[in-house]
Amino acid sequence: VPSLITFSGLVCAFSAVLLVMNGELTMAGACILAGYLLDALDGGVARFLGVASTFGLQLDSLVDVVTFGVAPSVLVYQYLQPLSIRPAIIWAACMCYMIGGVFRLARFNLLPAKGSHSESMGLTISTSGATLALCVLSNRTYDHRLIPASAFPALTVVLALLMASRVRYPALASVFRRRWVSLAGLAAAAVLAIWLSPQLVWLVLTGGYVSFGLARAAYGLLR
């Protein structure tokens, strides 16, 4: 069952690339986000069923490269092409992003297995891919005014550097481990999503998570 969920994420990634090729960027972004939800589900299902394995870990990493490395890069590249940005800059930013994602996954797979998964070294490739997809979706919803087009290459490179960095991020599962935090967070997100828009709320939450790791690292250096 967990492997079927993982392969479903790969289907989402392939569909996203095809949709980008056909100019359906909004649907492509939605497919990447669907892959993100599936990626969050497969590991938990494997642990719940007691079938977690090294094979599952390697399979998940390979699928992550496509779902959150290749697909978001292709999406951003195609989104920025008509927006008066030099193709070489877009290409370089997207390549940096994919390299950062592959590096992050390779390093993660070499780390010794630990009983606690409360933190991760470097921003996860899944969160990075979801962030890029959300940025594109939100910008298209708000007529390209939410995030300046000129900032997209820099944002893409920053995410690449965060993935390759040693900045520690709390695992999302540990953040919502306490029941009251989970219920309060879901309730607040649901209210905001109804009031504003689902992708914008998701983008704000993801952006806050990315910024939290940076702020905590900066605080640790200045202490």
Model-derived regions: residue spans:
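Topogenic membrane-insertion module of multi-pass membrane proteins
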Residues: 1-40, 216
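Hydrophobic alpha-helical transmembrane segments of polytopic
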Residues: 5-8, 28-35, 93-96, 100, ...
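Active-site His/Glu-centered metal-binding helix of metallohydrolases
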Residues: 11, 37, 41-45, 62, ...
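C-terminal ends of transmembrane helices
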Residues: 42-53, 102-117, 164-172, 214-221
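Hydrophobic, well-structured mid-protein blocks that either form specific transmembrane helices
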Residues: 88-131
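C-terminal membrane-associated helical module and adjoining short loops/tails
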Residues: 117-223
